[in-house]
């Protein structure tokens, strides 16, 4: 058996009353006896201080401090020490017989706080002969010694061979060594563990039932199921970490998206501005060169325009001088034409008026005759009307006598009266008062003859009148014609003047007949003269344009020379046109090709970027599309190989995970069904019984039990038989072993151990040979070792799987990139570089432009020469036909001569035209001018008198005729008297009156009508006379005006005047047109010169500004380029495809990216400030700084342990691959890590069952413990009802609450807490979080209720409380509980330390005088049975029969206080028999 470690001695150095004292400790009970103040408590305080050197826990209370809320300021330690270095050392020997001295160096710290400095240390390998006091003291003399400080102690021990000295800086390391060497029973990992240990020591020191321990019995007695708890914590931590990692991945993905967005927008923002500045710099350079070329061209154009301006100004001056003369000539010609037109119009008017006068003369004569006839008819009508009136009057007078009209008599009477009236009227008219009816006939003949005579006379006079009137009219006409031709003259001169005019008319008519031939001749000569003048002008212009005077004889030769030159220049111009057309076609083709290439360039550049990225990613160079497709095939093959290897590694990793999961099952069960069967059979798995077997013993026990290592140990096999019937849900081979699970051993088999193997004799005729497994899995230590190796393997496999997954995803992404490249860019990626071709074409275009410019200049000169030669030929073509005119010098004289003759002829023609009609009219009647018919008025009066006489004679004859006709009526004189009342006569008279009145009415109407007609005839006659007189006056005026005009108006005069005017107008128009052209050209030339001057100034200004801008921008651009190259971002910023975008597009792109960046960096102060600074358009380098800052910002956030690159873009690509792999792996891991609620319930139940069994074993050791009336002590362990219900729900009804356990938002602990709250809504959880509650529910100790019960007297079993027990009973019961705790700790910690070490057991009891002798004897027996050491402090009542007793007496000698110690070993005889379960016999008294 393994010997238990023991405390050999306690050494106090420089304590109050103890300078150098060593107390040898008994193997069982050491008693410190002495009076008050003897040093018992100091001694035990030194022991406790060396055991637990934690100033936060140490507090040595005096009994006088009972009820005090706080002790002394030094907590009882400072006052127990003396000044200087103090030591408290424990000399121990462990189960391995190793001597270990542990202790502390104490030293008071000066100050009012009364602090103590403690330094723990340990000494190993010290020989048994060396006493602790010899180590720490140095003898100065026989009665003097010195305490060594810690450093000297260290030096002293290091000088001793084989001795190890360790000084500890932490209490945890100190206690860890003590636990490993078997000095303390439990590993004290934390301050909480130290506190529990101290409370245990303190409870034993002061005795009684400690409320601090009884309230926390679960923490003291029930070991923390660290494996299960750690598994749950690891699972939750792994799940939490998994979910946090997934969340971090999602955040990282969003960060990645943000990074991609940031780098994309930053690249767009800066690259667009970078390329815009690059484009602008190139554009500015091109503009500067263009400005320089335009400046040179403009200067040349300005000089040419100045020369042109001088020539045009000179020509304009000449045309301005000629224009005045032409305007005067034209105005004269226009005036002459107007005069001719006026004269012609006057002549036309004169002729028209003369014709009108002739017509009016004829009409006037006709109208005179009509008027004369109308007058005669008027007179007849008047006579007839008068007769009708007379008859009416007569009838009315006759009718007045009504009686006469009554019968015939009345009629006759009326006739008679009428006859009388007619007779009276005839008397009156004929002036014959003696006229009678009888003499009427005679007188009628007389008067008829008289009428006839008067008529004849009137006709004679009328004839004479007519003849006189004709003669008078002819004379007046002839006289008026002479007056009209010659002007006013005497009537007697008319004849001579008329004859002279007729002779002159003949001469003028002869001259007038020559007008037309002369005019034609003059027109011909004038035309020749004008042609001669035109030829002279053309010759002068030609000479001026040619800049040389030519003779007429030289013109033909010059014409031939110019035609030859035209032919030559025409060929040159034609060839030049063809050449220019060829050059322009080539230029257009180049331009079209350049445009096509510029459209293709961005696509090609994008393809090249993609190809370069692929080349960088795969490290290969591709020269053709075939290389790409071949590499893609290789990539596919590599991807398949990587996938196969990844799947193999993944399968192996899954197998390792499954094995880890299987080995991690509680109790070592690899099959969950075994746990259920063990619970059903009421047994325990064999693996659980051997769960604490060491790693060294695991191969042996694994081989010992062989296939039955997974057996179920049951108390009674006979009770299991009934359960085996119909059992199907079990492994193929189920082993059952009968035995007590609490005291099971390996004696069931007969076994022989061989080298790395065993032979198990199962029966007489059946042996089993089993070799030790290379990887044992029997026992928790073996499983944990295997799990550790599996975890290591899993880490390697996980790393390899991650690497392969990364490679696969990288390969897949590379394959996708290749596929995208093949689909999008393969067709153009391997074509020729369009930019290089564009550069070649641009250089060729420049050459073509230069050739075109030179060609245009040459062609312009040739064209100018051609135009000049052509103009010269044209001028000569117009001049050469007129060479004879140019040689005719007498043409102008002949024109003047003919013009004079024509003037005379025209004058004659005008005279003939003016007076020709008058002369023609005068010629036949000129003879009437010889005599003047002045008696015409007398004849006219005689004619009128003759007409009146003829009219009177006619009336007289008519009246006499009426008398003669009524001559019979004169015989009715008697009837007039007789038939005055006759009615018939009256009626006849009335009828006759009516007829007479009707006749009178007709006569009146005829008279009125004829009078109106006569009036009209007279009006027409007056109108004709008035028109004739008016036109006569107008004709005279027109003739005078025509004479005043002084122009001969013949038929061709107007045409000649118009032709002359039109020719002059054409010349003037041509001159003006040319002058206007010259003025416009001059104005245009001046404007062009002004424009050229302004353009020249502007070009000079723009050129110098542009050159300055280029020079200025060059420095900034150099700085930008230097910054770009220094930071290695040129590849990112110099995006050549952007060079083909316009500045507005690039600015828009940059502005859009700027807006996105403002939002993206809103939370980053540094980037926000750098971005704000980069917005200055005058500082482009700040944008580069911003881009570098973004890159630096992203580089700082690259996980170098995951992504090994400094390029954020590549990091983002790798991040996408890694995040995708991690997401997939963590999702799979989360599914594997998740644990079912039934498994949790089974684990907790198994743990509770195991701990209940262990508590029962502890209770067995306390059955015979008695103190006073207390006959026995036990621990009662029960499962709480609420927690039992939780376990039932977890194992049986978990499907109803899967909403909690399947939630990704809740951890398993939180889901468990939610379920607990759901099942127990009445319980107030307080302020604790679900996570805290869930972690408590995962600890099986919280499911149990523990309390201490004592069997006291007649009360039976009751709860152990201080108030129900006496002091001694309470002390004894508390000591029993403490012993159970220590034993529980040892059991819990057995697997943590070496199997060959049994730890020391030691408790304290201060003021043991409260126990009686029997209780003290019980303590002695308990210590002996449990191999426990006990230190008791009592005044005097402890008899030194057993153990070792020290008598302490405090003395004062020469002002020096010390404690006198006397030791006595026990002398009681040996007991006849030992207590049950004791390992050794009690020591003999000495």
UniProtKB/Swiss-Prot annotation:
Q: List locations, semicolon-separated.
A: Cytoplasm, Nucleoid
Give the region (Flexible hinge) as residue ranges.
666-783
Specify the superkingdom: Bacteria
Please list the residues that bind ATP: 34-41
Q: Which Pfam families match?
A: MukB, MukB_hinge, SbcC_Walker_B
Q: Name one GO cellular component term.
A: cytoplasm
Q: What does this protein do?
A: Plays a central role in chromosome condensation, segregation and cell cycle progression. Functions as a homodimer, which is essential for chromosome partition. Involved in negative DNA supercoiling in vivo, and by this means organize and compact chromosomes. May achieve or facilitate chromosome segregation by condensation DNA from both sides of a centrally located replisome during cell division.
What is the designated name of this protein?
Chromosome partition protein MukB
């Amino acid at each position: 058996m393994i010997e238990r470690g023991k405390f050999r001695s306690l050494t106090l150095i420089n304590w109050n009353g103890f300078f150098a004292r060593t107390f040898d400790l008994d193997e069982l009970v050491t008693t410190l006896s002495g009076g008050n103040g003897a040093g018992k408590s100091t001694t035990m305080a030194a022991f406790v201080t060396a055991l637990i050197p934690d100033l936060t826990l140490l507090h040595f209370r005096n009994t006088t401090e009972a009820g005090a809320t706080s002790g002394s300021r030094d907590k009882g330690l400072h006052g127990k020490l003396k000044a200087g270095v103090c030591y408290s050392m424990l000399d121990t020997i462990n189960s391995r017989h190793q001597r270990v001295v542990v202790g502390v160096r104490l030293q008071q710290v000066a100050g009012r706080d009364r602090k103590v400095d403690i330094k723990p240390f340990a000494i190993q390998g010290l020989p048994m002969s060396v006493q602790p006091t010899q180590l720490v003291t140095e003898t100065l003399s026989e009665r003097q010694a010195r305490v060594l400080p810690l450093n000297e102690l260290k030096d002293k021990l290091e000088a001793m061979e084989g001795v190890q000295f360790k000084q500890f800086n932490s209490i945890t390391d100190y206690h860890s060594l003590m636990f490993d060497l078997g000095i303390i029973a439990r590993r004290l990992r934390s301050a909480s563990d130290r506190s529990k240990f101290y409370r245990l020591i303190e409870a034993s020191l002061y005795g009684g039932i400690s409320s601090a321990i009884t309230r926390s019995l679960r923490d003291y007695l029930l070991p923390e199921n660290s494996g299960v708890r750690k598994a749950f914590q690891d699972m939750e931590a792994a799940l939490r970490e998994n979910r946090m990692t997934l969340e971090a991945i999602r955040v990282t993905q969003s960060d990645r998206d943000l990074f991609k967005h940031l780098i994309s927008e930053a690249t767009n923002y800066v690259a667009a501005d970078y390329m815009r500045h690059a484009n602008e710099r190139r554009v500015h350079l091109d503009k500067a060169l263009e400005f320089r070329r335009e400046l040179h061209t403009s200067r040349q154009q300005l000089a040419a325009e100045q020369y042109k301006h001088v020539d045009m100004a000179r020509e304009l001056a000449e045309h301005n001088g000629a224009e005045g003369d032409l305007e005067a000539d034209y105005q004269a010609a226009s005036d002459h034409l107007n005069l001719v037109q006026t004269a012609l119009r006057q002549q036309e008017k004169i002729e028209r008026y003369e014709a009108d006068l002739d017509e009016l003369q004829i009409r006037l004569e006709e109208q005179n005759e009509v008027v004369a006839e109308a007058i005669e008819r008027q007179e007849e009508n008047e006579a007839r009307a008068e007769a009708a009136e007379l008859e009416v009057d007569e009838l009315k007078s006759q009718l007045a006598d009504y009686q006469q009209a009554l019968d015939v008599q009345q009629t006759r009477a009326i006739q008679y009266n009428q006859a009388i009236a007619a007779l009276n009227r005839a008397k009156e008219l004929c002036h014959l008062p003696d006229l009678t009816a009888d003499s009427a006939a005679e007188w009628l003949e007389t008067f008829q003859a008289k009428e006839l005579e008067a008529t004849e006379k009137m006709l004679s006079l009328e004839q004479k009148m007519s003849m006189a009137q004709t003669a008078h009219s002819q004379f007046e006409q002839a006289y008026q014609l002479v007056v009209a031709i010659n002007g006013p003259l005497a009537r007697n001169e008319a004849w001579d003047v008329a004859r002279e005019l007729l002779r002159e008319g003949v001469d003028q008519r002869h001259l007038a007949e020559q007008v037309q031939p002369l005019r034609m001749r003059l027109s011909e000569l004038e035309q020749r003269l004008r042609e001669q003048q035109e030829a002279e002008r053309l010759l002068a212009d030609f000479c001026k344009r040619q800049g040389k005077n030519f003779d007429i004889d030289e013109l033909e030769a010059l014409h031939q020379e110019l035609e030859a030159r035209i032919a030559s220049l025409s060929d040159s111009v034609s060839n030049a046109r063809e050449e220019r057309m060829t050059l322009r076609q080539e230029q257009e083709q180049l331009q079209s090709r350049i445009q096509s290439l510029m459209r293709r360039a961005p696509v090609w550049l994008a393809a090249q970027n993609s190809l370069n990225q692929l080349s960088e990613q795969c490290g290969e160079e591709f020269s053709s599309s075939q290389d790409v497709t071949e590499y893609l095939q290789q990539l596919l093959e590599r991807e398949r190989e990587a996938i196969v290897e990844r799947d193999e590694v993944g399968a192996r990793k899954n197998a390792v995970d499954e094995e880890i999961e299987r080995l991690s099952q509680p109790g070592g069960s690899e099959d969950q069904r075994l746990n259920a069967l063990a619970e059903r059979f009421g047994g325990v798995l064999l693996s659980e019984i051997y769960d604490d077997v060491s790693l060294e013993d695991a191969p042996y026990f694994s081989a010992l039990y062989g296939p039955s290592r997974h057996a179920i140990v049951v108390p009674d096999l006979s009770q299991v038989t009934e359960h085996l019937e119909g059992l199907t849900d079990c492994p193929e081979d189920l082993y059952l072993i009968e035995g007590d699970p609490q005291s099971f051993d390996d004696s069931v088999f007969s076994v022989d151990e061989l080298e790395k193997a065993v032979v198990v004799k199962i029966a007489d005729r059946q042996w089993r040979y089993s070799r030790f497994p290379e990887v044992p899995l029997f026992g928790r230590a073996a499983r944990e070792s295997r799990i550790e190796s599996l975890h290591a393997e899993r880490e390697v496999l996980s790393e390899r799987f991650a690497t392969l997954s990364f490679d696969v995803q990288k390969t897949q992404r590379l394959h996708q990139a290749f596929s995208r490249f093949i689909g999008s860019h393969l067709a153009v990626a391997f074509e020729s570089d369009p930019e290089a071709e564009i550069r070649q074409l641009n250089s060729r275009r420049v050459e073509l432009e230069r050739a075109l410019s030179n060609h245009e200049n040459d062609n312009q000169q040739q064209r100018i020469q051609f135009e000049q030669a052509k103009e010269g030929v044209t001028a000569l073509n117009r001049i050469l036909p007129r060479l004879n005119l140019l040689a005719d010098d007498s043409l102008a004289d002949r024109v003047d001569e003919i013009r004079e003759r024509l003037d005379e002829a025209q004058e004659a023609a005008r005279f003939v035209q003016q007076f020709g009609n008058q002369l023609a009219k005068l010629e036949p009647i000129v003879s009437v001018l010889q005599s003047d018919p002045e008696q015409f008025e007398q004849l006219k009066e005689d004619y009128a008198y003759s007409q009146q006489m003829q009219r009177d004679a006619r009336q007289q004859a008519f009246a006499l005729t009426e008398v003669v006709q009524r001559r019979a009526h004169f015989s009715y004189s008697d009837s007039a008297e007789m038939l005055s009342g006759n009615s018939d006569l009256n009626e006849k008279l009335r009828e006759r009156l009516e007829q007479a009145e009707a006749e009178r009415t007709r006569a009146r109407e005829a008279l009125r009508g004829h009078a109106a007609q006569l009036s009209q005839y007279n009006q027409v006659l007056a109108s004709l006379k008035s028109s004739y007189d008016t036109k006569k006056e107008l004709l005279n005026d027109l003739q005078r005006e025509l004479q005043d005009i002084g122009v001969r108006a013949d038929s061709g005069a107007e045409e000649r005047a118009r032709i002359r005017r039109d020719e002059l107008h054409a010349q003037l128009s041509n001159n003006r047109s040319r002058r206007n052209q010259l003025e416009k050209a001059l104005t245009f030339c001046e404007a062009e010169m002004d424009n050229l001057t302004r353009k020249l100034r502007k070009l000079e200004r723009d050129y110098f500004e542009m050159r300055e801008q280029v020079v200025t921008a060059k420095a900034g651009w150099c700085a930008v380029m230097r910054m770009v190259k220094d930071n290695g971002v040129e590849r990112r910023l110099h995006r050549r495809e952007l060079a083909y975008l316009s500045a507005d597009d690039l600015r828009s792109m940059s502005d859009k990216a700027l807006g996105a960046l403002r939002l993206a960096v809103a939370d980053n102060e540094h980037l926000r400030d750098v971005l704000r600074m980069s917005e200055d358009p005058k500082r482009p380098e700040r944008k580069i700084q911003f881009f570098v800052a973004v890159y630096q910002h992203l580089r700082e956030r690259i996980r170098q342990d995951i992504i090994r690159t400094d390029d954020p873009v590549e990091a983002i690509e790798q991040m996408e691959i890694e995040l995708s792999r991690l997401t997939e792996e963590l999702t799979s891991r989360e599914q594997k890590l998740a644990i079912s609620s039934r498994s949790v319930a089974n684990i907790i139940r198994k743990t509770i069952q195991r701990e209940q069994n262990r508590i029962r074993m502890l209770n067995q050791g306390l059955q015979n413990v008695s103190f006073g009336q207390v006959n026995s002590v036990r621990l009662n362990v029960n499962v709480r009802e609420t927690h039992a219900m939780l376990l039932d729900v977890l194992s049986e009804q978990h499907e109803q609450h899967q909403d909690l356990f399947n939630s990704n938002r809740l951890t398993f602990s939180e889901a468990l807490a939610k379920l607990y709250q759901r099942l127990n809504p009445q319980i107030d959880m307080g302020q604790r979080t679900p996570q805290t509650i869930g972690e408590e529910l995962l600890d099986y100790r919280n499911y149990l209720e523990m309390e201490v019960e004592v069997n006291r007297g007649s009360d039976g079993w009751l709860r152990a409380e201080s108030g129900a027990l006496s002091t001694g009973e309470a002390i004894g019961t508390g000591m029993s509980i403490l012993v159970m705790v220590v034993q529980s700790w040892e059991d819990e910690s057995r697997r943590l330390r070496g199997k060959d070490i049994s730890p020391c057991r030691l408790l304290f009891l201060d003021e043991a005088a409260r126990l009686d002798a029997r209780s003290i004897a019980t303590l002695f027996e308990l210590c002996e049975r449990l191999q426990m050491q006990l230190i008791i402090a009592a005044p005097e009542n402890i008899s030194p029969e057993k153990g070792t007793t020290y008598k302490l007496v405090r003395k004062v000698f020469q002002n020096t206080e010390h404690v006198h110690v006397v030791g006595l070993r026990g002398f009681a005889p040996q007991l006849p028999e030992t207590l049950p379960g004791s390992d050794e016999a009690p020591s003999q008294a000495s």
